Amino acid sequence: MSNYNAVTAKNTENAPNGNGLYSQTVAFSHYNNLSAQLPIEPQTGKLVAGGIKEQAEQCFKNIKAIVDSIDHVMSDIVRITVFVKDIKDVDAVDEVYKTFFPTYVPSRTTVAVAALPMDALVQIEALVSHGEGTIPNAPQAGDLIKLTNNTANAPTSPLSTQTVSFSHYNNLSAQLPIDPKTGRLVTGGVQEQAGQCLKNIKAILESIDVPFDDIVKINIFLKDLSDTEAVNEVYSTFFPDSAIARAVAYVPARTVVAAAALPMDALVQIEAVVSHGDGTPPQAIEDRHGIVIWANNTENAPKNSLSTQTVAFSHYNHLSAQLPLDPKTGEMVAGGVKEQAEQCLKNIKAIVESIDHVMDDVVKVNIFVKNIEDMDAVDEAYKTFFPGGVPARRTVGVSALPQDALIQIDAIVSNAEGTPPKA
């Protein structure tokens, strides 16, 4: 087994610790998954003094400390996700952002949410390339390059790259419903806006010669969760895209999140994670024939016609967000937030086990909670599933969740065996 990648968690004293609940960064294969960073001073464990600017700076300092501690640099970051409490604070965050990314800019998602841990104003997360891989005692050359791409056929921004490819994944900036010709929001309501977001994603993928059905995970941020049905109507006209994908009814994994606000006062914003069989140099393009998408659903977790429970490509599995639904009844589990958190994690465990994996293979967990004060109760349940506190983690408070749930959880899982074509 020694020639397989291993889940590698790391922590440094120069950034806030996860109190045994999560690691600062978990590397697997060619990516480091960082826990979302709060504006906490590592020395004191308290929020930094000052306003939004000081808080944003502290988040980036913490990210930099983690990145430095694993012998990487800030330009190895392929995606940044910025969560703010107040969308008007984004300009101040951007001022700080520029000082940490003076030339190269990663792909980026910006969203305002209802609440953040410790009453912070901002929380920032980074995904970092890891060319050396994680095969124990056998580091790779680390010579993979990342490819950045922008097309005039989708909205451009000086603060983000439309897509950053590294190894077998493309990471797209979240797309707003902006008409690239005018630079303004498209006219119409949420359906027109959702259509424009998806058109922009399609334009970016076409510009790098990647089919739309190579998307493995979609994250939809909605200003009003009650718009979900309207967005689904548009969504189902885009997926599946090709005849071959329709033949197997392939749809990506998916998470829907209620945003307190979105940039430009948009009603919807859509983020895509995309498989990249061509790889990045010096990986050989023709090797793509040896890597395919594995999509999987199990009866032991709730099913949804618009999303696959887990989609694997190469060394990662991407899980759809799990609600606290009992898969047998399709109903919300009885009890409070602790029971709900437990059910979400049971569903994740059922999905993970259905693809012959174990919870130790989980590298990153994203928690969306209705009431941020509930996190102590959530953590009680969480610890029983992740006693070692290994996976990296992100927690955000949201104003609403599907089916009036109190919590929703999704996960990224390592996939050491890869995804060769099945005989």
What are these regions (language model features)?
Residues 1-61, 65-78, 84-199, 203-216, ...:
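N-terminal presequence-like segments and the immediate start of the first folded domain
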